[in-house]
């Protein structure tokens, strides 16, 4: 069943960019190799996300930059249905590497929430955390100042069955609330922003890198307020779910946001199938940090690739190649 689902997702949603290059693509999202990978190098397929999304663009930059540096492997980028689909594709051998949210990989490794019906996926390992995907509770109602003020309100919690929906449940639970306390609305980030602008909903959970385009666009049409997730409730949330990390949304991130906002984030994380060689993963993660400046030129998200944050919020075992790299840097992840 898992195999069939993964193949359907791959066929319906993937657009593979082969290393020999293909015309007409966005340079930032391409995977044409301009390097000279050694003969016999392991060819690795990197599963990302939709072609208009950040994962795909970030993966394309990795391929473009790192294929000039790698000798043990070469990268081919493929577009997918993002985190959950990527886990399935790795499990079924349709991909070797993937970018996923760390909460989704936790669900996969434990067979919970998004993966409760399917059971555990155990044939993948963590490589490194890349950047924050911030839990942003957004409203245009100045009277909503706390998560507790959502009681009785209409709140968008992301698409039905999405990772965002589970994040919303977890945040509400930390404040002693549940979906029974709100009127649940399911929609994408873009649609929820439109509904906020039109007054159809009172608030929306958005889980994405800040600033998020949908929220930026909303702030040009209405006064936006970002509600904090902080204090004892945040501490409780992080105790219950190790994949959350503390995050501050700086003042000025959105138009009219005059003060810092405390909240939590999940992390966009690079993972690898367990059968990818230790040497290949070691060389890859080392090349990412050694060539960060060049990666940043391709996509600003690589500004957030920091050694001190690369293992935070990750509770899934690390690949031996990553263990070797971090050990050399004085970080014990074994």
Where are these regions (language model features)?
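Pocket-flanking alpha-helical
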Residues: 60-64, 76-117, 137-140, 190-195, ...
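Extracytoplasmic
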Residues: 41, 72, 82, 92, ...
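Bilobed "Venus flytrap"/periplasmic-binding protein-like clamshell domains
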Residues: 41, 45-69, 73-77, 132-198, ...
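An extracytoplasmic/periplasmic, membrane-proximal ligand-sensing/linker region
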Residues: 191, 198, 208-228, 233-242, ...
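Short beta-strand-centered segments that line the small-molecule binding cleft or hinge
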Residues: 107-111, 122-129
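Short, low-complexity disordered leader/linker segments with a strong preference
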Residues: 1-44, 334
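A bilobed periplasmic-binding-protein/Venus flytrap-type ligand-binding module shared by bacterial periplasmic
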Residues: 132-144, 240-242, 263-279
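Pocket-lining segment of extracytoplasmic ligand-binding domains
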Residues: 102-104, 111-115, 179-270
């Amino acid at each position: 069943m898992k195999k069939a689902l993964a193949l359907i997702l791959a066929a319906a949603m993937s657009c593979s960019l082969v290393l020999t290059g293909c015309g007409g693509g966005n340079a930032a999202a391409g995977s044409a190799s301009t390097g000279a990978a050694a003969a016999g190098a392991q060819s690795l397929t990197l599963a990302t996300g939709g072609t208009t999304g950040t994962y795909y663009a970030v993966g394309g930059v990795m391929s473009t930059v790192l294929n000039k540096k790698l000798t043990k492997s070469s990268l081919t980028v493929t577009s997918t249905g993002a985190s959950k689909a990527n886990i399935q594709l790795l499990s079924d051998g349709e991909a070797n590497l993937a970018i996923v949210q760390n909460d989704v990989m936790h669900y996969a490794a434990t067979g919970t929430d998004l993966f409760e019906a399917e059971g555990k996926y155990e044939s993948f390992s963590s490589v490194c955390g890349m950047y924050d995907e911030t839990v942003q509770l957004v409203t245009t109602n100045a009277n909503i100042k706390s998560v507790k003020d959502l009681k009785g309100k209409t709140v968008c919690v992301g698409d039905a069955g999405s990772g965002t929906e589970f994040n919303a449940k977890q945040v509400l639970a930390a404040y002693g609330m549940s979906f029974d306390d709100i009127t649940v609305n399911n929609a994408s980030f873009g649609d929820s922003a439109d509904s906020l602008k039109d007054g159809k909903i009172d608030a929306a959970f958005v889980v994405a890198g800040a600033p998020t385009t949908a929220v930026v666009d909303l702030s040009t049409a209405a006064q936006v307020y970002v509600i904090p997730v902080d204090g004892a409730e945040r501490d409780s949330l992080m105790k219950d779910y190790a994949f959350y990390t503390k995050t501050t949304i700086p003042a000025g991130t959105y138009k009219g946001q005059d003060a810092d906002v405390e909240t939590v984030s999940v992390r966009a994380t690079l993972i690898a199938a367990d059968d990818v060689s230790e040497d290949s993963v070691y060389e890859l993660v080392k090349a990412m940090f050694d060539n960060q400046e060049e990666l940043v030129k391709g996509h600003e998200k690589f500004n957030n690739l920091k050694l001190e944050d690369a293992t935070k919020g990750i509770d899934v075992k690390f690949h031996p190649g990553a263990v070797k790299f971090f050990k050399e840097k004085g970080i014990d992840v074994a």
